[in-house]
């Protein structure tokens, strides 16, 4: 009897050790109750994921007869990004426990809210970012750039949508997809149009000949869920593959939230598929190490600089920041044939994305090598960049 007890205890302990971990968030205010991101182990195939999802769906069907469970949706969406597999859903505690015990699951994380990183300040003010990134020395508004101007590069603006009819896009913008239920295929906020035009606009942008694809993943108030951002990333990779644009694509994420490992992995795998990913450092005036997407691997994270080549007061900083780029008082296009001025690392990121697109077009550099090349080209100009942070300011290599 004693031997049986010892063996049974050992098996139970082994099961507990093998169970997947539910990653805890240091900040609970942005967590979506009962909603989870489930990341599968590397050995899990696409077919394995489909079978696993069927199993989870059956579990949920059994659970919805229990009190308090009927309002949970169960499985929502599966993610297949460059060989990386995950899914999202809302589950009761018993179903979650079964998922954690499944040997195909790597870890589980709460779905969380994420927000834009731009602040509207005023309308119709002159811009300065274009001139700054095309000159080593400060003080000029002339924008000097390679004539290829991002030609042949596809820019994915994952944001609040894009006003694709705005004249600043010159007919180069198309609607891609909308993953936010209950919203229209438009940009009622303005943030998405502003960031896309900063990167690609004919007047306000850097890569003036790039193709533009609108991907709506944030609602009309500038907020969203990481589960939807991941869905948008999956769509972008699939769309780029269909268009033979992998290796010739840029994706911008001007958003920020608490660190979410599942989201970081999705972003990294999108980058690894052959897309240059520019991201915002965040607007909390703190170290961006614990922020997503800033902390994701293989992305080019931008902090915001001022017209005086100083760190913008709200900009995050830290070792994950690869470059500073103009981010304070940036004029760009906004919906309904308008313009506006916004401030934040949301504006810095598309500067990096736009220069990255021009570099890919003119020098035929692979997306995976773009950020390192931008760092190599950059000007050491930013004063008081923050602790453990580069002082490198984005430069497009114009020779000026």
Curated annotation (Swiss-Prot):
Keyword Glycoprotein: yes
Residue ranges constituting the Peptidase S8 domain according to the UniProt record: 127-400
GO molecular function: serine-type endopeptidase activity
Its EC number(s): 3.4.21.-
Keywords: Glycoprotein, Hydrolase, Protease, Secreted, Serine protease, Signal, Virulence, Zymogen
Glycan-carrying positions: 138, 252, 336-337, 388, 396
Stored Pfam families: Inhibitor_I9, Peptidase_S8
Subcellular localization(s) per the UniProt record: Secreted
InterPro entries (UniProt xref): PCSK9_ProteinaseK-like, Peptidase_S8/S53_dom, Peptidase_S8/S53_dom_sf, Peptidase_S8_subtilisin-like, Peptidase_S8_subtilisin-rel, S8pro/Inhibitor_I9, S8pro/Inhibitor_I9_sf
Keyword rRNA-binding: no
Domain Inhibitor I9: 35-116
CDD domains per UniProt: Peptidases_S8_PCSK9_ProteinaseK_like (cd04077)
Signal peptide: 1-19
Family: Belongs to the peptidase S8 family.
This protein's name: Subtilisin-like protease 11
Biological source species: Arthroderma gypseum (strain ATCC MYA-4604 / CBS 118893) (Microsporum gypseum)
GN (gene name): SUB11
